[in-house]
Swiss-Prot record:
One matching Pfam family: PCMT
A GO CC term attached to the entry: cytoplasm
Listed EC numbers: 2.1.1.77
Function (record text): Catalyzes the methyl esterification of L-isoaspartyl residues in peptides and proteins that result from spontaneous decomposition of normal L-aspartyl and L-asparaginyl residues. It plays a role in the repair and/or degradation of damaged proteins.
Protein family per UniProt: Belongs to the methyltransferase superfamily. L-isoaspartyl/D-aspartyl protein methyltransferase family.
The protein's name: Protein-L-isoaspartate O-methyltransferase
Thylakoid found in the keyword field: no
Amino acid sequence: MTPRLRLQPESVGIGMTSQRVRDRLVERLRESGIQDEATLNAVRTVPRHLFIDEALASRAYEDTALPIGHGQTISQPWVVARMTEAVLQVAPKKVLEVGTGSGYQGAILAALGLEVYTVERIGDLLRQARKRFRHLGMNVRSKHDDGRIGWPEHGPYDAIVVTAAAPALVDALVDQLAVGGRLVAPVGGASSQSLVQLTRGADGEIAQEVLAPVTFVPLLSGMLD
């Protein structure tokens, strides 16, 4: 069951950010193949309009990616839901998110009661995301660092969600995945990417599965303030 968020009036929304509009988004996601009810309830509950610029708030509950500045985007809700649904299948408790961005994916995971660690290379985006987490009463642990390194001090993780695409799965992140854990990440270049899930079995063996074609911004090294 999704924990109740401490929502302020502006979080609940009216008009194009109202509960009715959110319910319509959830039904579209359900029709597009998202089946996990906890995931759908988190999408219904977390106020996506607070994670984007106010000028775009009327589009917050469209099933589309939107710009958040610094050449980055808030992911399409279907993609967020599909990645969340995939990691929930292994019943995780502790999750690493690589690429905080607006904070929306991390908020979805936190709303599901998971222990969330998130890393972002762009300082300005991370500062904004932290404000949103505080506003919603979410205890998300965050770090300004190169996401390709992960956050090994708190590993291993039951699940890892990567929100930017690399040409191949990053070994440093795979190494932080616990036995029985699952990593979900976009893999590929600018012209072709796939959402891939990697599961580490009890014997340590790695199994991979392609979930869907996707389009993400690239996973870059280094840090920006």
